[in-house]
Amino acid sequence: SSHEGVGGFLHLMAGESATGTGGSVVISSGLGKASSSGYIYLRTSESGTSGRSGAITVATGTATESSSGSVKIGSGLSNKGIAGQVEVSVGSSTLGPGGIIAISAGGTSYDGASGGSATVSSGRSGSSSTSGNIMLSVSLQF
């Protein structure tokens, strides 16, 4: 921490390889053998009186001669209970506009290739139930 200036910096990086695959970084919560596993909570701190709070970026690196990596966000399988949710939300504001969620597929400048697709699909069901819903709504003005 710092009383003046910039606080500390943490750089977590796996090893590199000149001829093979670079190292991996795994962050895992603790196992709960008789109960729940632990949480992983990733967040920035609040800002001071005249600044913004920090940003979180999750991205793969650029690939110059092959495909770049994927970013996957998901919940785990549940054998007997309800599977976990994936929620994406942005903040509200008391004096300014609310945050924006933008979902867009990748484009290409190559004439012989198509742009990426964006797909929204509900979950399938067992033979005696219906599949999940897809709901879009617009909030009312206050």
Model-flagged regions — what are they?
Residues S1-F142:
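Surface-exposed, glycine- and small/polar-enriched segments that build interaction surfaces at terminal
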